[in-house]
Curated annotation (Swiss-Prot):
Positions glycosylated per UniProt: N217
Regions crossing the membrane: 41-61, 94-114, 175-195, 227-247, 248-268, 292-312
Annotated PANTHER family: ETOPOSIDE-INDUCED PROTEIN 2.4 HOMOLOG, P53 INDUCED PROTEIN
The protein's name: Protein EI24 homolog
Pfam family, one: EI24
Length: 320
């Protein structure tokens, strides 16, 4: 038991350290001008415009409205002016809501849509920068050897139309799985006493999976292999996702969304440049153990996804 606990802690710390290896982002951006451009666009939209707008609102607009339309009277204010305090509070609240409805919420949606498009480009350019670079050939060889066992999935997938259909099916299932897992994360957060702890843990796994999914997509690793590898090495990925969650866990939804939109591509690039297969295998060789065992992280999401797909299959013939 003590040996297992040490293994969990070491793998968690290894994952945490990998996520914090942000120097890889600088190296990859220096190798690829396209990557630097996309990353800069992401920082401009989410950092300067989105997060900057929230800062201007909090530190300038809101205090100014508090001063112009106060809801409490100072001793020097006339009684006639004070009689409008309730109306001023209502008017100020309405103006604040207008800012949210016509600026922050549309900006949030724009950021969400563009960022998701840019994230894929960032991961692709980062992956290409690693592949074509000969400045770090030893690292490329190390990752190539580590991914060899996982890339065996490519041989199992048929070519032609059959392979395309399997790929589409995997994408549909993956979307359903991650959607239900996200809902599970939200529901777990309202559980008394232990809800916040479970929410933090599930969020860590969710962000870690998102970060590595880009790399696995470009590596051609099948969905089954990804899920098996992820759930078999849950301690490492819990550690990798922890810095992502720590950065936003105690912030308001809009601020956390803006900050995560800035940080997420950095963690994606960190995941793209990392080799978790060898990092995870090192402790096993040191302790001569088989690993921690598979943890069914996606069990609930998988059950709901299969249920949704079975309902869809039953309804389709009936409609025809």
């Amino acid at each position: 038991m003590r040996s297992k606990s040490k293994q969990v802690l070491l793998l968690w710390l290894e994952g945490f350290r990998e996520a914090c290896s942000l120097h890889r982002v600088v190296i990859l951006c220096l190798r690829s001008r396209k990557l630097l451009l996309r990353t800069g666009q992401c920082f401009l939209l989410n950092g300067l415009i989105f997060l900057g707008s929230l800062g201007v609102f909090k530190w300038f607009i809101d205090p100014s409205l508090q001063w112009i339309l106060p809801d409490q009277c100072s001793p020097l204010t006339s009684q006639e002016f004070c009689s409008y305090g309730g109306f001023y509070a209502f008017l100020r609240g309405g103006l604040l809501q207008l800012f949210y409805v016509f600026w922050f919420y549309p900006l949030y949606m724009l950021s969400f849509i563009l960022s998701n498009i840019w994230y894929n480009d960032i991961a692709k350019h980062g992956f290409e920068a690693i592949e074509i670079s000969d400045l770090n050939s030893a690292e490329a060889l190390r990752q190539g050897e580590a991914l060899a066992s996982l890339n065996m999935a490519n041989a199992e997938r048929p070519s032609g139309l059959g392979g395309v259909m399997i790929g589409i099916g995997e994408q549909v299932y993956s979307i359903l799985l991650l959607t239900f897992f996200f809902l599970e994360v939200c529901v777990v957060g309202v559980i008394p006493y232990i809800g916040k702890i479970l929410n933090f843990l599930l969020l860590s796994w969710m962000y870690a999976y998102y970060c590595y999914e880009y790399k696995w997509n470009f590596s051609g690793i099948s969905l089954k292999k990804r899920l098996d590898f992820f759930q078999s090495n849950w301690a490492f990925f819990a550690g990798f996702g922890s810095p992502c969650v720590l950065a936003i866990f105690f912030l308001s939804p809009l601020v956390s969304g803006a900050l995560m939109a800035i940080l997420f591509p950095l963690f994606v690039l960190t995941a793209t440049g990392s080799g978790p297969e060898k990092l995870i295998g090192a402790p096993r060789r040191t302790w001569k153990c088989a690993g921690l065992g598979k943890l069914p992280i996606f069990y609930i999401a998988d059950t709901l996804s299969m249920l949704a797909l079975s309902i869809f299959r039953l309804e389709s013939p009936h409609e025809n």
